[in-house]
């Protein structure tokens, strides 16, 4: 199996409990920039190092919001020929969904609030917090 990671902190914690051989590969995809809302423009910041051809793939994401970024990403990854492609997310905001994205494994459904910590950031800050908190804007 191969995992693609949106939330490095999450997968590092979970990898300690995985008892089967896996290959971890990291990909960085962004549609936020320095804003709190998705721009809708998907940017591949870092692509995968390994081929997905005929592999069982689980995309591990920190948060699923509008679905725009993940819809684009999942379609792109399907074109690379994996045997299967599943999506796991720590946090899901289903009420924010603009594009239908099927999430196979969800940690927590959360309301439409901007959250930081445990790998999630606001303008590259607060990623290091050992918990997830809500940012309140005035």
Q: How would you label these PLM feature ranges?
A:
Residues 58-59, 118:
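Residue-level marker for buried hydrophobic side chains located in beta-strands
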Residues 1-6:
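Single conserved hydrophobic/aromatic residue that forms the stacking wall/gate
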Residues 9-10:
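Active-site loops and adjacent core secondary-structure elements that bind or stabilize anionic groups
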Residues 21-57, 66-72, 99:
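Short, glycine/charge-rich flexible loops or terminal/linker lids adjacent to PRPP-binding catalytic cores
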């Amino acid at each position: 199996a191969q995992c693609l990671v949106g939330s490095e902190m999450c997968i590092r914690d979970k990898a300690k409990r995985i008892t089967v051989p896996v290959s971890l590969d990291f990909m960085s995809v962004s549609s936020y920039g320095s804003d709190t809302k998705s721009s809708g423009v998907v940017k591949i910041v870092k692509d995968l190092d390994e081929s997905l051809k005929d592999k069982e793939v689980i995309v591990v994401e920190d948060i699923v919001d509008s679905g725009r970024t993940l819809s684009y990403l999942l379609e792109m990854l399907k074109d690379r020929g994996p045997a299967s492609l599943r999506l796991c997310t720590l946090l899901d905001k289903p009420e924010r969904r603009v594009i239908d994205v099927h999430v196979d494994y969800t940690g927590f459904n959360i309301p439409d609030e901007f959250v930081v910590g445990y790998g999630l950031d606001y303008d590259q800050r607060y990623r290091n917090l050992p918990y997830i908190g809500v940012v309140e804007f005035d």
